[in-house]
């Protein structure tokens, strides 16, 4: 768009939803749309323990670290409990397969959480694991994963197991 830049994820989501309304990126029902925006805002600003202790890493498989984090970090338990509550309520209310029935911005917002659950093999309920698997299988998420795997930059401090 002629060099127009938007850098905040919620602003990006709103811009895309307005620019491409035919994709119905937000739920059409006003109450569902408000709830979707609310869970996106919560995701945007919350879950700091999960973010701190389970860094985003699409390439790695770190179940051993996940077990240690799960054992030692009560904040991660609290974050995952809240995430499970959000997801199970929305999946039940809207009938799945995504949080608001069809794919929405809310599912995109939670894709990094799904990735962390996979990377660290964090314990979640079967229903939540099924949702994680559905999100991971989305073509857009698969494209994101492939792009991430093609990157070769890393920070030694964040990824000491990769240091050569």
Language-model features: where?
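GST-like fold's C-terminal all-alpha helical module
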Residues: 43, 47-137
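Short, thiol/selenol-centered motifs that function as redox-active sites or metal-ligating centers
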Residues: 6, 36, 107-108, 138
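Active-site-flanking alpha-helical
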Residues: 17, 113-114, 145
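Acidic/histidine-enriched, glycine/proline-rich intrinsically disordered or flexible terminal extensions
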Residues: 148-164
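Short secondary-structure boundary/hinge segments and terminal tails
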Residues: 16-17, 135, 152-154
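GST-like domain detector, emphasizing the conserved glutathione-binding G-site
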Residues: 1-69, 162
